[in-house]
């Protein structure tokens, strides 16, 4: 079965790969700095990013300072989403990363850049284009998660809304953060995208900077290959907000200002396994292997 899935994913990849454009967005040469966000917030966000990998029937359980209040979908046809109420991050929605489902895999390999759908168009600056598969994954969950977020904001009298996720869920995090910034009166509070692939073009990256810059962060772990893909010369570009953990799974992390920072994760050749993709982020295990169910926050010792 696994070979069949890999074969289908390969065929889809071949059919969907865009022509190289050889056009790059900006590259930052700013020196790295210390973290611009408190470490406990990153640890807490990592735990909630992992939790969608866990199964149903966990409403009422806690992840760090957060209670799980809603969960939907099982990651086969639609990526699982969970909503928490966190003392430190408010109403938080988290999206599941890629599963073994062929439909989930197809979201990753549908690499064509497309204009935002009409429902998202006003959330982006003109000229923004998004990776098609990630848009499809987000649109599948958009309406139901938004309705539940609004309910939770009212229930807990909390206007803070945070978005998080890992891998494919990190790409969905970026799209959801932009969407919610536009739709909610108070916008988003924070967004944390763990192991995020490139999700759109240079105009998309600039849109993120213009609209949620300083509140959006994406985290790369060691030589994880996922944040390196799709390549920049296919027209893709990361926004600002990179936090790089290097060496992998260590407590050596720094913030790399600007887009595609020259001193950041782009300086290393990616390792083509999932060893660095699933790992320890700010003392919290994320992904298959390091993560626990329910997720444990900040329990890993270095």
From Swiss-Prot:
Keyword Translocase: no
BP GO terms, sorted: lipid catabolic process
Primary location: secreted
Signal peptide positions (record): 1-16
EC number in record: 3.1.1.-
Active-site residue numbers: 167, 224, 277
Family to which the UniProt record says this protein belongs: Belongs to the AB hydrolase superfamily. Lipase family. Class 3 subfamily.
Record protein name field: Secreted mono- and diacylglycerol lipase MDL6
Annotated organism of origin: Malassezia globosa (strain ATCC MYA-4612 / CBS 7966) (Dandruff-associated fungus)
């Amino acid at each position: 079965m696994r070979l069949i899935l890999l074969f289908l994913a390969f065929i889809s990849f071949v059919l969907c790969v865009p022509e190289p454009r050889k056009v790059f967005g900006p590259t930052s040469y700013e020196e790295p700095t210390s973290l611009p966000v408190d470490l406990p917030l990153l640890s807490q966000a990592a735990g909630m990013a992992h939790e969608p990998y866990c199964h149903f029937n966990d409403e009422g359980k806690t992840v760090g300072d957060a209670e799980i209040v809603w969960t939907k979908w099982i990651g086969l046809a639609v990526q699982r989403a969970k909503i928490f109420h966190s003392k430190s991050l408010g109403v938080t929605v988290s999206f599941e990363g890629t599963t073994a489902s062929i439909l989930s895999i197809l979201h990753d390999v549908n690499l064509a850049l497309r204009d935002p759908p009409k429902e998202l168009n006003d959330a982006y600056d003109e000229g923004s284009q998004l990776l098609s598969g990630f848009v499809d994954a987000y649109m599948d969950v958009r309406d139901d998660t938004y309705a539940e977020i609004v309910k939770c904001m009212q229930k807990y009298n909390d206007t803070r809304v945070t978005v998080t996720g890992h891998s494919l869920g990190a790409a969905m995090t970026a799209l959801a953060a932009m969407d919610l910034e536009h739709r909610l009166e108070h916008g988003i509070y924070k967004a944390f995208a763990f192991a995020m692939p490139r999700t759109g073009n240079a105009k998309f990256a600039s849109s993120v900077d213009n609209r949620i810059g300083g509140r959006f962060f994406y985290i790369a772990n060691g030589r994880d290959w996922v944040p390196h893909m799709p390549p920049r010369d296919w027209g893709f570009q990361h926004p600002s907000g990179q936090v790089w953990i290097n060496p992998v799974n260590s407590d050596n992390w720094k913030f790399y200002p600007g887009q595609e920072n020259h001193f950041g994760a782009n300086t290393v050749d990616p390792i083509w396994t999932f060893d660095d993709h699933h790992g320890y982020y700010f003392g919290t295990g994320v992904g298959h292997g390091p993560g626990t169910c329910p997720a444990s926050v900040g329990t890993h010792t270095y």
